[in-house]
Amino acid sequence: MQGWGDRVSTGKRSIVRNERTGHIVGEDIEDATGLWGSFKGLMFRKSIPDGYGLVFRPARGIHTNFMRFPIDLIYFDKANRVTKVRPAMKPWRWDFTNAAGVIEMNPGSAARTDVQPGDLLRFEEEA
């Protein structure tokens, strides 16, 4: 059962595919838009389903304050090329960068789908 904090209402959802491997990185990737979506992110959630992720654009700094579980961070540039992967960032940590965007996902997601710096991500918008 989903609660008030389980989704960020944006309307834009994508499937993200790794062009190098062909693997689907996430089948339910949601854009965090607007002040509330960008502020709240994954805070206060007890968990997220496998394959779900949240995209922040731009990604100047990410924190895991008030989070209950670690997350994988997949940073990418304006061409959607992966610039950095930070696996299993624990709660109450900060990571600063100047990326065009970042995907926050369950820990192990990047390794399971073999995402590495230099990979090209393809965002396929859901209908």
Identify the residue ranges that each predicted region occupies:
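Compact, glycine-rich, soluble single-domain proteins
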Residues: 2-127
